[in-house]
Amino acid sequence: MEARLQSEGRGFGALSILRCWLGAALRTALAAAAPDQTAREIENLSHFLKKQETLQRLARAFGYDASKVTLSPQTKTFDYLGQSFTSEGQSFANGCIEIYYDPQMSDARLGCCLAHELQHVRYFLVRDAYCAEPADGPLHRRFAKYAPEALAAQRGVSNYSNEHWDAWKGGAPPTLFSFELEEGGSEPINETIAEVAKALYNWGPDVRINPLWRELHDAINEEYTALHRG
């Protein structure tokens, strides 16, 4: 798979595939963390401390608990489809997010990475609520229109998300709020929605983007907000 992404309007240059997927199969492929002494040295660098402050500020600007977002001095890699990639960030089901320090990472790129990972956190929370309710529950009713065939027909909104569609190995198109990685070896829906969030952050609300994916992104965020209020 060619590692590529489109350039971003806020100076977010062309990227390799840098998303670290959740799931035990890929977690075991993560490289060992940098030695402790090296990590401590990095954490004391003035540039690292400045980026850490910027990340905390960005998290607060997103309305997110900054204590759950950390800048890690570690470098992590993962193998996917026979290639090795470096991860920019990782989100966890408990709402925590790690961004991996890169001295070359601009503030714009840092914000885009955080926007992408935060959307995964929102998706996970709504997915958990969806899976916990009965088949005729309110979330099932709201999201019924986003059938597998309808989403598959749209494909992704970026080269990166389209690579997830190309890599899908399931016997049928992926289903919204399913455990895609376990079922088909990639996460087309989850990653496409996260790429919508990144595009909206990067280009603003007037960005031209697939209307069905934009609608689904907005619906997930509305339900995420409602779940938090509840």
Label the model's feature ranges.
Residues 55:
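Active-site helix/loop module of the DD-peptidase/beta-lactamase fold
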Residues 1-7, 11-19, 24, 28-32, ...:
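Non-Sec secretion/translocation targeting segments of pathogen effectors
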Residues 47-52:
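Well-ordered, non-membrane alpha-helical segments in soluble/globular domains
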